[in-house]
Amino acid sequence: MSTEDKLQGLGLTLPTPPQPAGAYVRAKKTGNLIFVAGQLPLVAGDLKYIGRIGDDLSIEDGYEAAKICALNVLSILAAEAGSLDNIAQLVR
C-alpha cells in the first residue's frame, strides 16, 4: 500500500502543490535532500486562515490551518520526489 493510499484511508487527499506566494522557489532538491519553503494555509491559491489563534482564530482553526500546511508540504515533496514512497525521512 502506497503512502498516498494510506493518506486516502485516513480521509486525506494531497492537494495540487501550491505556487510560491512570492519570489522564491517552493522546494530545492540537493543530492538526496529536499528543502521545502515555509507554508501558508493555502487552499486552491486562496489563504484560508488569517489572524492569530486566540484573538482572531479558534484552536480548531489553528489545527485545520496546520493540517492544510502539512498537506501542502507533502504534496510538494511528492511532486519533487515523484512519490511520497521515495521519501525516507522527514527532518524538522
Protein language model annotation of sequence segments:
Residues 1-92:
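Short, polar/acidic, helix-capping and beta-turn segments at strand->helix junctions
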